Amino acid sequence: MDKPSDDELVAAVASGDEAACRALMDRHLARMLALARRMLGNHADAEEVAQEVFLRVWTHAERWEPGKAQFGTWLHRVATNLCLDRLRRRRGTEDIDAIPEPASGEPGPDRQLEQRELAARVEAALQRLPERQRAAIVLSHYQDLGNIEAADILGVTVEAVESLLSRARRQLRVALATEKDELLRSREINA
């Protein structure tokens, strides 16, 4: 038996079907959490955004127009906009450079430490990017969306997404190269 499509589930949610809403959450929650965590830099804020995304699904399901866009694209747009709103509100009031826990791996302790340090440096550099560039990188590289879909989510042209990605990649390269040089110099001094 085929699983119901997102459009079918949203129609059921519009009729008050809680099980359909849970099914949509089961299907999309992990990606919304990952997107929000990368955008916001911490898990607690990401969980709040993900909850708000699905609260909006519940409260606005009757407005969904099947065929106008993919449901997943709409969810990404809602999550991205909520993240951008949250970043704008906290600008100047909170340190955006807080580094969340990095991904773990199976290699030995030394390699795990190196991987965590690299992940932390990349995450810190990502958090220093301007909001729109960060959103473009997160959608493209971490959410594996194409430029057309990212453009739709961000409400810009494909060319604008390509420009945002180009500038973001350049800034990340410069930030990480500068940090690498500083790290090497500090190791030479301490050696």
Name the predicted role of every residue range.
Residues 14-15, 41, 52-69, 89-91:
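Sigma70-family region 2
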Residues 99-124:
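Acidic, proline/glycine-rich intrinsically disordered inter-domain spacer in sigma factors
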Residues 3, 86-105, 181-185:
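Short, basic/polar amphipathic helix motif occurring as a linker/hinge flanking DNA-binding modules
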Residues 59-66, 77-97, 115:
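Arg/Lys-rich amphipathic alpha helix in sigma70-family domain 2
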